[in-house]
Amino acid sequence: MVYLLAIIALLITFILVPVLIPTLKRMKFGQSIREEGPQSHMKKTGTPTMGGLTFLISIIITSILAIIFIDNSNPIILLLFVTIGFGLIGFIDDYIIVVKKNNQGLTSKQKFLAQIAIAVIFFILSQVFNLTDFSTGIHIPFINFEIPLSIAYVIFIVFWQVGFSNAVNLTDGLDGLATGLSIIGFVMYAIMAYFQGATSIGLFCIIMIFALLGFLPFNLNPAKVFMGDTGSLALGGIFATISIMLNQELSLLFIGFVFVAETLSVMIQVTSFKLTGKRIFKMSPLHHHFELVGWNETKVVTVFWTVGLITGLIGLWIGVS
């Protein structure tokens, strides 16, 4: 069953992308590029965005099949809820930017409130309706200790889901970067879930891996399509949720290390400029800094993937120790 669902996830995405690209072009759903960004990016203007729809559709269809045919599908129901919720926020944001020609998209407040709502509903579904049995404390690796939070854990869920959904969104600025890092991350969590005996979560990770593998060939440099906020916000929300459901929250700091580094680079840049009027990096997020240093896009992506693989293995080691 696992192999069949993996193949279905791969094929749905791989078939949908070539169908969607001309449709997006015809509807002029193209990406706008920041003028102050690297000049090499200007050629990307008009590249179809919202491509994340393809792998989200694949994930939804394949997950529904899994829910129908496997036992103990409650974790998949929860993960599917988060996928659809964060994906919908991203879709609305993309729609406003691309169709309504409003580069701001949803306001930060609107996004934050929507993300809070999803996090709270996730907590209620998991704890009140007992759809899964993860603890409401933060697990500390190696010392077999947990910081109990009880009902306050919902605050952590909000912070974790919102933080990582936006972290993946910030990272999705180079062809194939966020897609490749996400594949690496879900491989690590699939293995971790296997060691924990969390078969449903492991199956969902495998579905994610193969759905993204179907998208990757079209997203590599030169990208024929971008995932947009539709894809990136969903991926970040899923990563946070899986780490929570496996009670391995802190492992995500390593498995998602590049996402964290990209986010910190933006925070450091903004803080430094406000306090001193000086910038630490040539440009943020971090991948743009390396481009302006002289690295070509493919080199940046390859190096970041390599870093993601190394830190991902460290995160896996932490998660299974």
Swiss-Prot record:
PROSITE patterns: MRAY_1 (PS01347), MRAY_2 (PS01348). It catalyses: UDP-N-acetyl-alpha-D-muramoyl-L-alanyl-gamma-D-glutamyl-L-lysyl-D-alanyl-D-alanine + di-trans,octa-cis-undecaprenyl phosphate = Mur2Ac(oyl-L-Ala-gamma-D-Glu-L-Lys-D-Ala-D-Ala)-di-trans,octa-cis-undecaprenyl diphosphate + UMP. InterPro entries: Glycosyl_transferase_4 (IPR000715), PNAcMuramoyl-5peptid_Trfase (IPR003524), PNAcMuramoyl-5peptid_Trfase_CS (IPR018480). Its cofactor is Mg(2+). It is an enzyme of class 2 (transferase). It is a multi-pass membrane protein. The chain crosses the membrane at residues 1-21, 50-70, 76-96, 112-132, 140-160, 173-193, 198-218, 225-245, 250-270, 300-320. Its EC number is 2.7.8.13. Pfam families: Glycos_transf_4. GO terms for biological process: cell division; cell wall organization; peptidoglycan biosynthetic process; regulation of cell shape. One of its GO terms (cellular component) is plasma membrane. Disulfide bonds: none annotated. It is found in: Cell membrane. Keywords: Cell cycle, Cell division, Cell membrane, Cell shape, Cell wall biogenesis/degradation, Magnesium, Membrane, Metal-binding, Peptidoglycan synthesis, Transferase, Transmembrane, Transmembrane helix. Belongs to the glycosyltransferase 4 family. MraY subfamily. Catalyzes the initial step of the lipid cycle reactions in the biosynthesis of the cell wall peptidoglycan: transfers peptidoglycan precursor phospho-MurNAc-pentapeptide from UDP-MurNAc-pentapeptide onto the lipid carrier undecaprenyl phosphate, yielding undecaprenyl-pyrophosphoryl-MurNAc-pentapeptide, known as lipid I. This is Phospho-N-acetylmuramoyl-pentapeptide-transferase. It comes from Staphylococcus saprophyticus subsp. saprophyticus (strain ATCC 15305 / DSM 20229 / NCIMB 8711 / NCTC 7292 / S-41). The lineage of its organism: Bacteria, Bacillati, Bacillota, Bacilli, Bacillales. The gene is mraY.
